[in-house]
């Protein structure tokens, strides 16, 4: 058993049997066909039940997050529990408006018809979530499924077994299995779930696993929402307020110890402010977490040994200029800045999902300074005392200015889930206009997800579909176009043999 108990729980957690998966899937389909979930009063009642359950189980959820992730109560509440309860309250207030049949304009050629847009639930849905925000990323989509009128199967991650078990118990106490149920287990359980014919699959995870989900969904033409990740760039221009940038970036990168799908992944920084930023970043990490970050209860650990080994493995891809301390027993990794990184190294091609930050320096002319080539022998990662020989590193040039180099760099890679720019707001809008990402911030990081009034989602390799607020309701709904035509008059021009075609052609 590890310090947080994860290994023991993974060995003893019972996988949901295939027979039970099939049975519950069929029961939920039959329950949906009964029409009970369609009633707006039923949906509101179920949302209120979920809200009451969240409030009742809050302390158990927070304790479980501490056990699995070393996530403090404050961070658990702010980044997980309160986001779900806030979403529930928002849906209770607005689902009546969202679900209402809406009148649409009818052109003259449809006279005497009335046109409507009608929302209907997609049906029986599957929601699969990852381990990094195991409460928020499983239950937030569920809110949309309930408000839309769907039945749902929830599949939490086996890597956070304590949280997954608490959620299973909470859902079982709150809802009937024929309405909402939780399935537990490993990839074999996932495979059995994906074999079923769902009316929609909502998946949060990696792009690699998303391809498996899409392949399974394609067999039945099942629609999907994919909330993925990627390498979200953080640009620091020379006009940036370095003190503010360092504080916000340090917070965003250490939140959940960098295990956030929209965490800033790598830094593209103007050479004139690079040294000042490194010093300010180090100071802000100390301000946030104290002189000995290992003693800070707000600093989250890596989810398991595999994640710890993967993230610390990135240290060899460059030279550490800040941080670098680790503790394998507790899976602690200090916030770490690394420079002289090969642009084709794993550190610059894989989503980091940890508190390690590659720093790429660019000058006024758009020259990327000193990126090591992957074929050269890597320097030993021993803090800032290690510097590569000049023969090992060579500058790369991108024509034009700093901003043009940034744009070229970002657009040459997969579209990220988030994009962050620090500098003049006008320049930020220019860079955003010429790049593509799921969302982003100017002079901030991560906070775009905190506004429940705007949708959240990826683009390209970082995902498809949107949720949060009305977008969650829309994600689990089908939009129908309905025309109701009066019978008191029947205009003849649409009927064969089109005797009025000349007149109709002039009108149309």
Regions from the PLM with identified roles:
Residues 1-11, 374-389, 393-394:
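N-terminal amphipathic/basic-hydrophobic helices that include classical n-h-c signal peptides
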Residues 9-116:
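N-terminal Rossmann-like NAD(P)+-binding subdomain of aldehyde/semialdehyde dehydrogenases
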Residues 15, 208-343, 361-367, 371, ...:
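ALDH superfamily catalytic-core signature
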Residues 36, 51-54, 58, 69, ...:
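Structural signal for hydrophobic packing residues in well-ordered secondary-structure cores
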Residues 38-39, 333-382, 396, 401-508:
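Conserved C-terminal structural/oligomerization subdomain of aldehyde/semialdehyde dehydrogenase
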Residues 43, 88, 149, 180, ...:
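Residue-level signal for inorganic ion chemistry
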Residues 108-244:
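Rossmann-like NAD(P) dinucleotide-binding subdomain of oxidoreductase/dehydrogenase enzymes
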Residues 164-167, 193, 213, 277, ...:
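Hydrophobic packing residues within well-ordered alpha-helices of enzyme cores
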């Amino acid at each position: 058993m590890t310090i947080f108990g994860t290994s023991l729980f993974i060995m003893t957690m019972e996988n949901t049997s295939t027979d039970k998966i099939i049975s519950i899937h069929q029961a939920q389909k039959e329950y949906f066909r009964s029409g009970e979930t369609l009633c707006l009063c039923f949906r509101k009642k179920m949302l209120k039940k979920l809200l009451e359950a969240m409030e009742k189980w809050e302390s158990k959820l927070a304790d479980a997050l501490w056990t699995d992730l070393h996530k403090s109560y404050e961070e658990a509440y702010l980044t997980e529990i309160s986001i779900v309860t806030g979403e529930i309250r928002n849906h209770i207030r607005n689902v009546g408006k969202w679900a209402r049949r809406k009148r649409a304009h009818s052109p003259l050629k449809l006279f005497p018809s009335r046109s409507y847009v009608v929302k209907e639930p997609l049906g029986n849905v599957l929601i699969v979530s990852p381990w990094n925000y195991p409460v928020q990323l499983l239950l937030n989509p569920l809110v949309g499924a309930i408000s839309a009128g769907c039945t749902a199967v929830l599949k939490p991650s086996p890597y956070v077994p304590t949280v997954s078990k608490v959620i299973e118990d909470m859902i079982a106490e709150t809802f009937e299995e024929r309405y909402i149920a939780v399935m537990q287990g490993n990839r074999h359980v996932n495979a059995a779930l994906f074999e079923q014919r769902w009316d929609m699959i909502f998946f949060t995870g990696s792009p690699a696993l998303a391809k498996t989900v899409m392949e399974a969904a394609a067999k039945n033409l099942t629609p999907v929402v994919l909330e993925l990740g990627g390498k979200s760039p953080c640009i620091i221009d020379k006009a940036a307020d370095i003190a503010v940038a360092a504080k916000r970036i340090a917070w965003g990168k250490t939140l959940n110890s960098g295990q956030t799908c929209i965490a800033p992944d790598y830094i593209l920084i103007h050479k004139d402010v690079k040294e000042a930023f490194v010093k300010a970043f180090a100071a802000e990490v100390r301000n946030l977490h104290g002189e000995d970050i290992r003693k800070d209860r707000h600093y989250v650990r890596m989810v398991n040994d595999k994640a710890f080994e993967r993230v610390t493995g990135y240290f060899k891809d460059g030279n550490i200029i800040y941080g670098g301390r680790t503790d394998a027993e507790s899976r602690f990794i200090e916030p770490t800045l690394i420079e002289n990184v090969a642009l084709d190294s794993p550190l610059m091609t894989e989503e980091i999902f940890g508190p390690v930050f590659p720093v790429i320096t660019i000058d006024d002319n758009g020259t990327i300074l000193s990126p090591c080539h992957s074929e050269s022998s890597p320097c030993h990662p021993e803090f800032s005392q290690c510097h590569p020989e000049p023969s090992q590193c060579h500058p790369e040039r991108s024509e034009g200015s700093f901003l043009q180099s940034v744009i070229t760099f970002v657009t040459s890679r997969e579209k990220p889930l988030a994009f962050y720019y620090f500098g003049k707001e006008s320049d930020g809008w220019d860079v955003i206009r010429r790049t593509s990402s799921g969302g982003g911030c100017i002079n901030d990081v991560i906070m775009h997800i905190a506004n429940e009034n705007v949708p959240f989602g990826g683009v390209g390799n970082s995902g498809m579909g949107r949720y949060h607020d009305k977008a969650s309701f829309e994600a689990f709904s089908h939009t129908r176009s309905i025309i109701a035509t009066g019978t008191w008059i029947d205009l003849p021009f649409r009927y064969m043999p089109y005797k009025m075609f000349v007149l109709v052609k002039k009108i149309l």
